[in-house]
Amino acid sequence: MIEGAQAGRLPVTVLSGFLGAGKTTLLNAILRNRQGLRVAVIVNDMSEVNLDAESVQRDVSLHRGRDELIEMSNGCICCTLRADLLEQISDLARQQRFDYLLIESTGISEPMPVAETFAFLDTEGFSLSELARLDTLVTVVDGSQFQALLESTDTVARADTEAHTSTRHLADLLIEQVEYANVILVNKRDLIDEPGYQAVHAILAGLNPSARIMPMAHGNVALSSLLDTHLFDLPSLAASPGWMRKMEATDTPASESDTYGVTSWVYRERAPFHPQRLLEFLQKPWHNGRLLRSKGYFWLASRHLEIGLLAQSGKQFQWDYVGRWWNFIEPSQWPRDEYRLQGIMAKWDSVVGDCRQELVFIGQGLDTRVLQRELDHCLLSAQEIAAGPLAWQALPAATAFDTEALSARPTPPMAVQPT
């Protein structure tokens, strides 16, 4: 018997992955080999006709008395249907008829918002975690296409209807699906030779060092790897991306590389970036190995009060602003709890406070010395720093980083060139 069901909370596994990765094949395989478990399934598809749900229904047609299929169409689990998802899971959990719940997410959603649904408190203080236990986040990737898709310039519709734009880059979606997973299944292993599989494995491990990465073909994978694993933990998941783990690590070298040449490197400096020189860096063709992922915080001279968040996946750099540096906030407005205060002071500098450049780069064949020189060139010179914030506002290309350009595609686009 599944432990969560015995304890009164319905255990849940969420299946994510891009369209065609093999989520439905995996779901069908689980339902065919569920070892007598009474399973409820929530399927989400963006189309009018939910073909994925129909295929699952055929597989469980002999067990309709014990299995329940719920279709959630015309929306996305991670955003527009969050309220519906809460209601559906709550209803299933209260029935106490099922041992397990499987959720197949749409191909254009990422796992983290689904996970946050379980921690969400409604207006009456109710949390879904009182009735259901999120057990495992599983991401399925097409091993035969994953590297090519990372290089794609294609865009997909955004699941997040409140975002700045209605589309996002495919590479960005794929990486987020990988970064926020407990288990990553490399599907179509039978179509990949051993060096190809190891190369994909190395990339995935660089993007998410804490995930369990396993090969899969035709949905065949041990049920114990997906159900009742107890791998999910929200704080740990939030810190699972490789870029974040590298940024927070204090006992590892600035640059690390494994046998397949996947390097993670952190750029740290305490001077602001010049907007024009930074923009030139972001727009120029990339010739320094193969850049897989970069993300982190930046300090821009023309917006010196604000914390910049720079993110790259595939061939696209994007930026946003996520609040003010604590250096420009009155101490009376600082957090009171010791844990958060320690976090602020851990990044504190006696001259510029917490203002900083802290960018993580993950890639293959990266020459970090070249990257260091290029980024150093983007910093303000001593003379420019001495001119002060008023002069910084008038620096060339300052408007390129205004709010209107938060999701703008740099022109010409960044060109990631594989080694």
UniProtKB/Swiss-Prot annotation:
Family named by the database record: Belongs to the SIMIBI class G3E GTPase family. ZNG1 subfamily.
UniProt GO MF annotations: ATP binding; hydrolase activity
Residue numbers covered by motif CXCC motif: 76-79
Protein name, UniProt field: Zinc chaperone P47K
EC number: 3.6.5.-
Organism encoding this protein: Pseudomonas chlororaphis (Pseudomonas aureofaciens)
Reactions that this protein is recorded to catalyse: GTP + H2O = GDP + phosphate + H(+)
Alphabetized UniProt keyword annotations: ATP-binding, Chaperone, Hydrolase, Nucleotide-binding
Superkingdom of the organism of origin: Bacteria
Domain CobW C-terminal: from-to ranges: 262-379
SMART domains, sorted: CobW_C
Task of the protein: Zinc chaperone that directly transfers zinc cofactor to target proteins, thereby activating them. Zinc is transferred from the CXCC motif in the GTPase domain to the zinc binding site in target proteins in a process requiring GTP hydrolysis.
Binding sites annotated in the UniProt record for GTP: 17-24, 79-83, 187-190
SUPFAM superfamilies: P-loop containing nucleoside triphosphate hydrolases (SSF52540)
